[in-house]
Amino acid sequence: MVSDYIKSYIERSLEQIRDKLPDKVIQDLREALLNTDINLTESDVDKIIDLAVKDYQESLIEPGEAVGIVSAQSIGEPGTQMTLRTFHFAGIRELNVTLGLPRLIEIVDARKTPSTPIMTIYLTDEYKYDKEKALEIARKIEYTKIENVISSISVDITNMSITIQLDEEMLKDKGVDPSSVKKIISKLKLGKIRIEDIDDYTFTIYFEEIDNISALFKMREKLLNTKIKGIKGIRRAIVQKKGDEYVIITDGSNLEGVIGIKGVDVNKIQTNNIHEIADTFGIEAAREAIAREIKKVLEEQGLDVDMRHILLVADIMTRTGVVRQIGRHGVTGEKSSVLARAAFEVTVKHLLDAAARGEMEEFKGVVENIIIGQPIRLGTGIVELTMRLNVR
């Protein structure tokens, strides 16, 4: 245990280096020093703090370091080793998830919707240890239409009627009863109708105001696509055990809809749809999600890339307050330099547009200076040195 005297000494020592280390590093250092089981002396504290300052300063980049190029090659080179497949979600046969290079391209292209949108929904303490309660929430979330709970539907053009046979197993699986299905149908705007039961799971709907086959088949489509319950976009919700708690994995994503459900832990909910995160929780959350998703994709392929390279990509994609792709319609296409834009793609168009607008090239970046053969402002090129020569 750390004595009270050493605790106060740690606080005083950390206060003295506040200008040398970021607040987060100081906070982590404080927790490590105060929670240790070793009996620390003043000398030990000084050595640990000096070592932390030294390590931090050595980890900083040198002035003029080409961080963009280093990040590009550090992510791009491992990216060449990635697979081009869609995998089954671990332990769940029904769900697929895009991994590897296709997923990385989705992220940096800032696609509006991922090819395999998935959510991981954590539950509050009241629900996460009880499988039945978790299933109850999963049923509330899963988007269910009438076509999902029927075994057959037949159209009788003689009597202008539609007969629906409900699937007992599917009703049980979705947590729906026949009476609620009939109640929903009776509330639809179908004109004047009459519902007659054949048995517990079969009933016929007679349309008394329809007199042509085309209208009857339109009613059939309307019935099949009628929502019974759930959140739009969530095609499937599966309860899975993670450690000692139950979580819900979904096929499909609707962050705004799910966070309103009682029992969902809003602080831990996850989705692989970056734009949904930006719209619901803001751009800072989207930045974190971009970094997390890229890191996850690389780690799944057994590739180790320093988090700082990934954070640079996330920062560039979100610096304007909206999520932008890295490409001609995003970061690269919006560079202030005419020559840099022209060097990337559609050269003639960029040059003509810039000439028509009377744009000025200021030669502040890397590409434009290389094009005209000037030293770039990176590395030693960032230093402007004047020497005074003693001329005799």
From Swiss-Prot:
Question: Which compartments is it annotated to reside in?
Answer: Cytoplasm
List keywords of the entry alphabetically: Cytoplasm, DNA-binding, DNA-directed RNA polymerase, Nucleotidyltransferase, Transcription, Transferase
Stored CDD domains: RNAP_A
Q: Name one GO cellular component term.
A: DNA-directed RNA polymerase complex
- Keyword presence, ATP-binding: no
According to the UniProt entry, its GO molecular function terms are:
DNA binding; DNA-directed RNA polymerase activity
Q: Which reaction does it catalyse?
A: RNA(n) + a ribonucleoside 5'-triphosphate = RNA(n+1) + diphosphate
- What Gene3D superfamilies would the database entry show? 1.10.150.390
Primary place of residence? cytoplasm
Query: What Enzyme Commission number(s) apply to this enzyme?
Result: 2.7.7.6
Question: What SUPFAM superfamilies does UniProt report for this protein, alphabetically?
Answer: beta and beta-prime subunits of DNA dependent RNA-polymerase
InterPro entries in alphabetical order: DNA-dir_RpoC_beta_prime, RNA_pol_Rpb1_5, RPO1C
- GO biological process terms, semicolon-separated: DNA-templated transcription
Q: Assembly and interactions?
A: Part of the RNA polymerase complex.
Q: What does this protein do?
A: DNA-dependent RNA polymerase (RNAP) catalyzes the transcription of DNA into RNA using the four ribonucleoside triphosphates as substrates. Forms part of the jaw domain.
Q: Which HAMAP family match?
A: RNApol_arch_Rpo1C (MF_00411)
Q: Which family does it belong to?
A: Belongs to the RNA polymerase beta' chain family.
The protein's name: DNA-directed RNA polymerase subunit Rpo1C
Organism, per UniProt?
Sulfurisphaera tokodaii (strain DSM 16993 / JCM 10545 / NBRC 100140 / 7) (Sulfolobus tokodaii)
The coding gene here is rpo1C
